[in-house]
Structure formats: C-alpha cells, structure tokens
C-alpha cells in the first residue's frame, strides 16, 4: 500500500485549521520520485487491467473526478514538486490521472482566490465564501479549533511535586467564548499552542484585551527544535485600556513555527483577576489554499473574490455560507448585529426606558423626559407590557455646582480667575490675603459636565456601541441599561493637570490633590464596579474595584503628580463572557464627585510638624536613606511562593518620598523604568510602600517579578516616645522588650488611599530602637504575631533597630581612669561606659597629665615620724618612772614619821613648815587617780613585794 503525506495548507474561516503545507519535487532517486513512478506503474497496471475481471468477477469502473482528489508531493531542494491524484477512501476505480509537475513551492494565490488543483490556476471564490489566499484565520471560537492545544503547568519548582499540592492545574485552560477565547483565571501557567509550517516568510496577527497586571501574558515562537526564535525578544504583551482591544503582530520565518500564548495568574488575595481575551488570529505565509471557505453564521459575502465576510446588520440574520442576510419580522422579532437567528421581542418593562433632564430654560425650569432604550427590543402591545410615561413635566433646575454660576442663561459657567461661588450665588472676589481653592465639585447632575463623557463597550460584540453608558438623574448619575449583561458601562473624567496653591509651589513629593466620590451599587446578580486611572494617556490601571451590592459609601484617591489624568468608572453586570440580552439589572449610582487640590493650611501645618520633628531626631540623620525588608516566604493556595517587600523612608529628603516600589511585570515596563520615563505609571513613591515579589524560580522566569505595589504611608503624622498617636496604638507585647532604659522613638504615618477593607485608609507605625550591636542601617523586623507586618491588613508595624537610633552622647556616658604616678607625673584617661548606649553628641575628652609625688618620699617621711614617736614614748616612760620612784620614797618617809609619834601626846596638827624643813617636796593625796597615776600603778605593781616591812621602834613611853 502506498502512503502519501497530507495535502497543502488550506485557508479557512470559522476557526477551522488548514492542512499543513507541502514541499515540492524531489531528485529522481528520492522517495518522492520512487513513489511517483510506483504510482504511475500502478495506474498503468490498473489501466491495462481495465478489461480484466475484478475480484468479484467484474472489471473496475473508470475513475470519475469525484472519486479522487489532487495533492502535492513534498518539495525537493530545488523547490519543485509533483501533483498526483489520490483516490478517495472506500472507492475502487481505475484510470487515475498521471502525475504532472506542480507549481513551485512558494506559489500562492491572492486574497479572495484559491488554487484550483485540476488546472493549477488561481480562481476567485464564489459568493458566500471567502479566502485569505496564503493565510489562515481563526475568528470563531465556539469550540477549540483543530490544531490548537492547551498545556497547563505549575512552574513552581520549590514547593514539591504536583501531587503534593492542594490543587492541581488539570482543570486550567483557555476557554472558547464564541467570538474570542479567554485565558485561565487561576495561578497556573497555561499555554495555548498552535503549530504551522510556512513555505515563505509571513507573520502572525491577533487582537487581544489585557487589562489586569495580576496576570503575566507572553507570546513567543519556537521552532521544531523547541528553541525560541529571535523575533520573540520582546515576548511580553503590553497592557491595554479597560474595554479596548489591542493588536500584536510578529514576523514569522519559513519553516515550522510553534506559536505560544502563555498566561500565568498571580493570586495573592481573594479578588479574582480579569482574564486575557484573544480573537481574530491570522497567520500569513502558508503555501496556498485549495478551497474557499463558507462565511460563518451571522455574516455574508455577496461578491465573488471576497477575502472577508461582512456582518449582518441589526434585525437580520444569516446561516452558514450565506450570500445575503434575511430580515426578521420587525413587529415581533429582533436580532443584534451578526446574529444567526431572530428572537421574539419581550414585553416592555420599567427597565426598558430611562429619564433625562433637559437643560434649564430662561425660567429656571427643566423638563423630565422619558425615552426608550435604543435599540428598542420590547413590545408595548403585549399583555403585561408597560407604556412609556408621559414626558414634559417641569421642575425647578438645581443650582450650579460649586465654582460655577448662572448668568441668566440656561447653562452654568465657571467663575472667573480670582473669584469663587458656592453655585447658588454670584461669583465674588476672594478676600485680601487669600486665594481660591481650585477644583471640581459635582453635586448636581442635570447635564453631563463638559469634561466628562460616557460610552458603552462589549469585548465580544458591538451591540451597545453608540449607547450612553451612564445617565444623569438630578442629584446623581447612574449607569445605563446597555445591550448585554457583560457590557462595560464607562464614564470618563478628563483632567488636563493640577495647579497647586501658591503656598505649595515648589513642594516636591507632596499631595497635589485628591478625588473623592460617593457611590452605591444595587445588583440582583453578579456585578462589579471598577475605578481606574490613566496618567498622561499611557495605560489605564485599575485602582480599586467593588463586587456585588454595596451600600452608599465614599472613596478617596490621592494625587501626587502634576500630570494629565483620566479617571474612569466602568460598571459591568457580570464578569463572565455571556451574551444575554433579556436581563437588565439594577444600576449603580454616583451621587457626588469631588476633585480638589490640597488645602494650603494643611500643607503649611505639615511643614511645621516636620520641622520640629527634625530637631528632635537629629541622631537619625544617617537613617535618612531607604530601609528595606523582605519577609516570608508565603504561599498561595496552589503553592506559588512569594515574598512581601517593604521600603521605608523615615522623613524623605528635601520633600521627596524616597521609598519607591515598582511593578516590573513585563520587559516593556522594565525598559521604561531604565529609560527614566517620568510617565512610568507602575511606580509608587511614599514614606512606606509594599510590593509582592515572586522569585524567578517560582514561575520559571529569568528574573524576579515585582507586582501589586501599594502605598502604605504617604502622610507623616508625627514622632513621639509615646506608643499612641491619632488612634494608632503600638501594643507592648507586639515587639520584644528593649534591654536598655532608653525609650523607643515611634514614627507614625497614614495613607489617604482607602480600600474596601480599610475605609479610613492604611496607617503605619515604625518603632526606632537603639541597638549598639547593629551598626549602620541596622535591621528591620515585623511582629512575630503578624509575619506580614499587619494583623488586619490596614495597620502595619515595624521595628527598626540600629545604633543610629541611639541618643546623643553626653558627659554621663563616660568615666575617667587615673594612671600610676611615674617620675612625678600622672595620666588620667576617659572611656565610654559599657555597653555604649549613645552615638555622636560630645566626644571623649583628651587624656590629662598632672604632677604627683612618688611613694618613696612619703615612705621616708612616715619612717621618720614613726621613729620620732618611738623615742618620745621611751623618754616619757622613763620620766614617769623616775617621778613615780620619788613619790614612793616620800610616801614611805611620811609613814615612818607618823608611826614614830604614836606614843606621844597628840600635838596640834600644823601644816606649817618647821624650821629646817625643805619646802621643795609637797605631797598631795587624792582619792581619784589621774591618768599618770594609773600608769604608775601599773608600772610599780610588780615591785610591791620588793619592799620589807620593818617594825619601827616607838618613841612613846609604854606607860602612856
């Protein structure tokens, strides 16, 4: 049996793939030549055996044109090929045409033509069909076209094998949605792959919508060796504005090209991401197309040689391969553009009309007018259908908005420069010494302001093009009806720039203004309201979104940059790709929009506060640069590893907030950042900011990715040693207790940007702690109880430890040490107390040198004094001893004299000195001993036994 490769690539419509293109003629010894000659031999044998009986005894019938088809062989090295006839399956016949030389391999027909294989000439496509010539197109996505494949992977190589993860990626894929195909919404990496073989250089073109930077979207091309082509250097696809389609085109080389549309979602919270949408994929450069393709339902082609099918207008429809569109019965049926059938008109309800207010007339009156939503699809003549309310009721016009006045006409005009008005009175000049606070404040919605516009957009169709997405309603503006449930109802506010007050001129990094709006959403099904900002017409970024029914509330967004802003509100009833036209949900409403610059006195107060704080934290001057902290890692539900990265700038520098966080989601934005573009919108600057970092190994990218940058602190509240300031409290057990007695210094900040979770904005507290063990910038940490830096998502806490946070040194922080006296001189040194809990301040005094006396001199003096004292004591002892001897002698003599006169008559006692007595001796008797007496007694006590008692002879007569 003889097998040949499939035929050449065919252009297609409605998303059907073309066959792979073929090469041409091979050398005579090649397999292609062998196959051709073998086929010719078989055909000759079949022709010669035409009269022979078949296996059933009957000859084979001759082959008709319907019994076979033509195909080309593979191309040889010279670019030639053969056209051969291939019998259709289950057909037995004889007499196939002989092989003939085919067209060159690079041959192709023009758009609107196809290659008629019998004569090998290009022919125009008939009515109801179309052809791209050498291209293929995929514009119908009711199902995944043949040739396309989905490959879902989880590229995190750190967490572990896929079977250990909580959820796999088996259910993640690109989903066909009719007119477009939609990417995955989870954090899996899903590739939409299509392989094509080109005979000549060509290109690939597709339209896409990519509005959410929480999804990475890349398009690249590989060859048959799985090597990326040079043309995929810039594989990251640019973001588009919300509700708008962008286009992407890449040149293709001849040969095999494998096309990849790859998306990776980054889910760090509960908020769902918006998927990437792709439609109208066109590939140019295939060899030829051998047939024209019928127009898809809802389109038609009324001319031969068409390369595109036209869309059927409203209230018409068409089937596949239509030459024209068929009109619906407009009395009872309707259809949208590009419909394949007509639908019955439903009865009219209150959701099928809206009211508007006419401009004020000269009498100050406005009329309430009721109109059907266009195009009108309902019927008034059915049972239970309502009628359109009567129009023309007059009411008093609301006053002008603040800053505008009524000059007697039917419209409001802005106040001249230097004047102001609350909207109800004439414009007045500002008092002396004051300036007008410029801004817009829309409180009354009688007519749409001149700098606002409204529109309707649908990603899959044009049903609501030309409709008003929002309608004014007196004291508020509300979303319109739209044409489908998944329409985007868009309201734009354009601001060419900001003019800060004179008192703020020259301030850098300051709050230039803010926009505040009050809104509520009333939804009976799934709905979402987006608030988006575009700076200098670069790209629209979603700032905040609210899903489902929300009560009346206010939201504020702060502006720090003087640039051209476009603020956008987009309301969508459902974020799924559906084409429901009969359901019309309740609207969302906005009551007021305030767009005002910051008041001058607030900015002046802030400058004074920073001035006083600067005097108190002089010791922190070396911490004026940005401190950084990366904590984690954390993991998503499917195991994606990520980190929280914080930048902290305590006081900024010359009014600039140095803490900057960026989103380098694509190579394109990285190039913008490197180029220093002032319009780089993926960059935020503040006192404290946060980014989500995804390491390179986590998703298979060549570099770490930074996304979801948010401002945590843009307003400095104050600095104090207290733990509470303006309702921001730092609990005592949040951080470890400081080992020193030095109090911690606390910096308090606030962010004016509010979110659905933080209605009062975010706040930040930074605890500065003196730690001599951490020099330089030190280290930043978060509470152990709140590893993400916050426990509620609204208040963030940081502990910054550094020696630079220590107080200034004083004379109480050092002590002196005296050295030894050497050669009459002595040194005094000064050293810091340990541990040293201070920095800078006063310096250590220089060492002091003073005169002194040595120890030898005083030793000699002491010895001399001691010797003198000893001699003196010996002399005194001898003196008192001699004195004591004399006293004892006199006492003994007195006693002897007294005893010798006992026998004599008593004589008169006399104290007088007798003649011949010596007056030099005097004896005094005292009952109380003196100190010397006591010493003498002690000295003579042992000598009492040395004296003998002698009986003296009495001089008295015994007879007396």
Swiss-Prot record:
- Output one GO BP term: negative regulation of nervous system development
Does this UniProt record's set of keywords contain Membrane?
yes
Q: Where are the transmembrane segments?
A: 861-881
Q: Which residues are glycosylated?
A: 171, 407, 622
Q: Tell me the membrane topology, using the record's own terms.
A: Single-pass type I membrane protein
GO MF term set: BMP receptor binding
Q: Which residues lie on this side of the membrane: Cytoplasmic?
A: 882-960
One GO CC term of this entry? membrane
Top-level lineage group: Eukaryota
Q: Where is the signal peptide?
A: 1-44
Instruction: Kindly state which keywords UniProt assigns to this record, in alphabetical order.
Output: Cell membrane, Disulfide bond, Glycoprotein, Membrane, Phosphoprotein, Signal, Transmembrane, Transmembrane helix
Indicate where this protein resides in the cell.
Cell membrane
Predominant subcellular localization, coarse grouping: membrane
| PROSITE patterns membership | MRH (PS51914)
The residue spans the entry assigns to the Extracellular side of the membrane are as follows 45-860
Q: What region holds the MRH domain? A: 597-808
Stored InterPro entries: Elapor1-like_3rd, Elapor1/2, Elapor1/2_C, Elapor1/2_GBD, Elapor1/2_MRH, Elapor1/2_TNFR-like, Man6P_isomerase_rcpt-bd_dom_sf, MRH_dom
Detail the disulphide connectivity of this chain as listed in its UniProt entry: 295-312, 325-348, 328-360, 599-651, 661-689, 758-794, 770-806
Phosphoserine modification sites are: 949
Residue span of region Disordered = 1-26
User: In which family does this protein belong, per the annotation?
Assistant: Belongs to the ELAPOR family.
Q: PANTHER family per the record?
A: ENDOSOME_LYSOSOME-ASSOCIATED APOPTOSIS AND AUTOPHAGY REGULATOR FAMILY MEMBER 2, PROTEIN CBG13728
Instruction: Write out the function statement from the record.
Output: Functions as a regulator of the BMP signaling pathway and may be involved in epidermal differentiation.
What is this protein's record name? Endosome/lysosome-associated apoptosis and autophagy regulator family member 2
